[in-house]
Amino acid sequence: EIEIQYLWPFLCTLAFGIAGAILSLWTQGTERLAQSIFKVFSCVSVGSVAVITIYIIVSGAPALAEIGVGNFLFGTEWEASSEIFGILPMILSSIVGTIGAIIIGVPVGLLTAIFLSETANPILAKIVRPAVELLAGIPSVVYGFFGLVVIVPFIRDNLSGRGLSLLAASVLLGIMILPTIVTVAQSALDAVPQKHYEGALALGADHERSVFRVVVPAASSGIMAGIVLGVGRAIGETMAVIMVAGNQTLIPASIFEGVRTMTANIVLEMGYAADL
């Protein structure tokens, strides 16, 4: 009996050790399983992009060989019925339209994010932020209709041209990228430690100087991420641009002339491409 009593602590320790080893192996196995699952999904994501890219290159290579890369990229005329394919007007329209959207949307979005994060009353911020996020869920065709009945007539009646123009597309895209820029930039500003702002105040800086000289630079990476996402939205937008841009495959001489972007051209010529 004495020997058994002495063995109990050893047996309990051994049992706990075995249980711990089993639990450790099970945990490691679970982690490895999770890592394997993540790797599989990562490979699927990367592989999907690679397959799409390869498919586009392989399918488009014969057409590029027949048309000529130079004629395709730098041609100034697009007439699919006459087999004239020059996409330079669409490239320039997409670039200029995106730049216009950045000029309009980035300052407004950034200042709105700074206001909501650093200046606005908390109650007001709780009301405005969901309203801004709600704008991100509005369909593109609704934005396009708004541009068609508000922006286009305003440009036509007060500025110049028919209203359906590069300027209308830029203004509309600037409005559409606001929710993305505001939401991401505000999250980046909220993530800046409060001690940065308090330290600037302690050194004698006022509120505005502390925000623009300390908090905003500290959140610059997140702000740039929001701007990049907004630019991606502007470049890829199609339906709203089709409704307000004027649909002219010409290099615009001014911002009051109609244009056709690359994405709009893809959609409008899809029926012709399907018959090739």
Place the predicted regions along the sequence by residue:
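Transmembrane alpha-helix signature in integral membrane proteins
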Residues: 2-17, 85-115
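Cytoplasmic-entry segments and transmembrane alpha-helices of multi-pass inner-membrane transporters
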Residues: 31-39, 108-147, 183-184
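Short membrane-interfacial helix/loop motifs at transmembrane-helix boundaries
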Residues: 53-83, 250-255
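Membrane-cytosol interface at the C-terminal ends of specific transmembrane alpha-helices
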Residues: 102-104, 110-116, 122, 126, ...
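Transmembrane alpha-helices
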Residues: 130, 184, 207-244
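Generic hydrophobic transmembrane alpha-helix motif, especially the helices
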Residues: 133-174
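Interhelical loop and adjacent transmembrane-helix boundary motif
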Residues: 241-276
